[in-house]
């Protein structure tokens, strides 16, 4: 009996491993706006859903790093659902306080941008499997706002 149960567990584990899963990628990270206390950037995330039913997104966790330091992090609870058999674009707003940008003055230099690494964890609720996290990481450069951006 025990042997039969082990075979059943292995069969289910193999089928779950080979199931198609949603895939995601960061398509863009851009300046969005300036407020009195922070600069807001917007990360665009493309997520494809291979299933014929919508899948709820539980949360999005993010961490923005520059010069080896975490400059922003947070969680976006319940950002919606993935469209059935389609690609969904998600907007992830990231707020960076002005005080932290000032501490990155060495990295900013003459080109008025910062090198960044954006780490995202997209937590989705897959039927049968349960919560599943899609880890994403993107490196690049973000332009800092100019005076004209602040008064536009």
Curated annotation (Swiss-Prot):
Q: Which PANTHER family does this entry report, sorted A to Z?
A: DESICCATION-RELATED PROTEIN LEA14-RELATED, PTHR31459
Read off the lineage from the record: Eukaryota, Viridiplantae, Streptophyta, Embryophyta, Tracheophyta
In terms of superkingdom, the source organism counts as Eukaryota
Q: Which residues are in coiled coils?
A: none
Q: Which Pfam families match?
A: LEA_2 (PF03168)
Name-wise, this protein is Desiccation protectant protein Lea14 homolog
- Member of which family? Belongs to the LEA type 2 family.
Tell me the InterPro entries matching this sequence. Answer: Lea14-like, LEA_2, WHy-dom
> Which GO biological process categories is it annotated with?
response to desiccation
